[in-house]
């Protein structure tokens, strides 16, 4: 067994010695060749993309040009169409032109008439309104006494509630003609008693004055 293990170890050493790495320059050249091939591939791809975009732009421009030419041709054909004079289309074309000219004439006439009326009105206003002369006489100022006297007159004309009630009551008595009935009913009333006492006092005072005047 020991001899077999020794033989197996020797075989592994021989295999290890047989593998010899190559030079480093060979590996570096292989890497540089791979990088250059990748760069060439990228450049070719970019060039193809640029050419495709240019072709697309050229096709779009050609389409625009063709569309514009078609549109111009259609316009020319429409403008160059001949129409007979007695057809409905010619009448429809001529009518709006006439109507617009008539409207413009009417508007011009109205504007001229309005301007003439305004000028005449201004002339009449200048003629009717004479210039105001400045008067040398000054107006008197209102005195405070006049205002106070006017206020007093207004206060006198105003009636109290009692005075207004008496006037209304007297008017009602005259309208209904109840004077006799009221006198009979109010013989023994408070108001008549007060009036009787006032009359007696006035008569007594007059007698006293006459007695004083005597020698």
UniProtKB/Swiss-Prot annotation:
Q: Where is the composition biased (Low complexity)?
A: 23-34
Short name of one Pfam family = BCNT
Q: What are the annotated disulfide bridges? A: none
Q: Where is the composition biased (Basic residues)?
A: 131-142
Question: What highest taxon heads this organism's lineage?
Answer: Eukaryota
Q: Where is the composition biased (Polar residues)?
A: 49-60
All residue ranges annotated as the BCNT-C domain in the record: 139-215
Q: Supply one GO CC term from the record.
A: nucleus
**Disordered: annotated span:** 1-153
Q: Which GO terms describe its biological process?
A: chromatin remodeling; transcription initiation-coupled chromatin remodeling
Q: What is its main location?
A: nucleus
Query: Does the UniProt entry include the keyword Signal?
Result: no
Q: How does it assemble?
A: Component of the SWR1 chromatin remodeling complex.
PANTHER family per record: CRANIOFACIAL DEVELOPMENT PROTEIN 1
> What's its job?
Component of the SWR1 complex which mediates the ATP-dependent exchange of histone H2A for the H2A variant HZT1 leading to transcriptional regulation of selected genes by chromatin remodeling. Involved in chromosome stability.
Name of the protein this chain belongs to: SWR1-complex protein 5
- What is the gene called? swc5
């Amino acid at each position: 067994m020991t001899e077999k293990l020794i033989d197996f170890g020797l075989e592994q050493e021989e295999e290890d010695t047989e593998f010899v790495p190559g030079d480093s320059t060979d590996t570096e050249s292989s890497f540089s060749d791979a990088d250059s091939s990748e760069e060439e591939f990228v450049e070719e791809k970019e060039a193809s993309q640029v050419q495709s975009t240019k072709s697309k732009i050229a096709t779009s421009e050609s389409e625009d040009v063709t569309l514009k030419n078609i549109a111009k041709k259609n316009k020319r054909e429409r403008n160059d169409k001949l129409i007979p004079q007695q057809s409905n289309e010619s009448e429809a074309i001529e009518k709006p032109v006439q109507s617009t000219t008539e409207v413009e004439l009417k508007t011009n006439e109205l504007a001229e008439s309005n301007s003439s009326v305004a000028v005449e009105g201004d002339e009449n206003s200048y003629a009717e309104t004479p210039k105001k002369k400045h008067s040398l006489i000054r107006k008197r100022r209102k005195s405070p006494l006049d205002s106070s006297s006017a206020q007093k007159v207004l206060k006198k004309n105003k009636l109290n509630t009692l005075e207004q009630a008496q006037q209304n009551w007297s008017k009602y008595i005259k309208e209904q003609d109840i004077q006799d009935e009221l006198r009979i009913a109010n013989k023994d009333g408070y108001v008549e008693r007060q009036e009787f006492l006032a009359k007696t006092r006035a008569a007594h005072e007059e007698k006293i004055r006459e007695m004083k005047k005597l020698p």
